[in-house]
Amino acid sequence: RTLDCSDIDHHLGKAITSSRIREPISNNDIRRWAHAMHYPNLLHYDPTYGEQSRYGKLVSMQSFPCAVDDGMGTSPACAGRIPNSHLLFGGEEWWFEDRRVSGGDWIFNERIPFDYVVKETKLAGPTCFQRGDNFYTNQHGQPLAKQRSTSIRYNAAAGGQNVDTSQFDEPEWSDDELEALEERKLGWIRMLRALGHDKRWWDDVKVGDQLPERVFGPHSVASFTTEWRSWLINT
């Protein structure tokens, strides 16, 4: 099998269109994102805590800018037609500026397809790994973050032949397993609350230290719904 990626070449290095937000960011937009990402930092949803911080107000998580994008940051990694193909999201890289978003701000995104490469995979033979960049700025033109997303594009028929149907069944969790999982989650939350407004420096962590793990899941209809509604394109 071959994979015709020639149409992608026409899009590389050229900005693609995007659907801009119609209203400024609100505090509840920021809260919904923190909720969806299971991130218990009071800085992103408690106004009193935010006022006591170095920011003096409630501010967003660093990853929040992608919540305003109508393609969730993936669009520049999907530009171009590959006939008879399917696509998987392959992850992303982030570069953050020391600048946060707060209520009243606007976020804009310039989306530019970056590059692609075709490699042989066990999944589907010739497989296209395509990357695209998102450049997020505020209403002052100041950069907020850069997000580089990767898509995995492959022949649909070839990929379907290699699907492992034994993994289709959903796992079942007992009450005891869920309770133990919640206790593991609380360990990280307690650490975050104990730190408060203090900073954790490099020297505060030593080789061999046992650090609390950040656990979230398992996903459910409720958790997926919470995440879906946090994207501004859905509100």
Regions found by a protein language model. Give the residues of each.
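Hot-dog-fold acyl-thioester-processing enzymes
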Residues: 1-91, 158-235
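Hydrophobic beta-sheet segments that form the core/acyl-binding groove
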Residues: 90-140, 208
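A structural microfeature
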Residues: 145-147, 212
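Short, solvent-exposed aromatic-acidic interface loops
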Residues: 148-157
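Short glycine/proline-enriched turn or capping motifs at secondary-structure junctions
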Residues: 84, 142-143
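Residue-level signal for secondary-structure boundary sites
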Residues: 117-119, 142, 157, 221
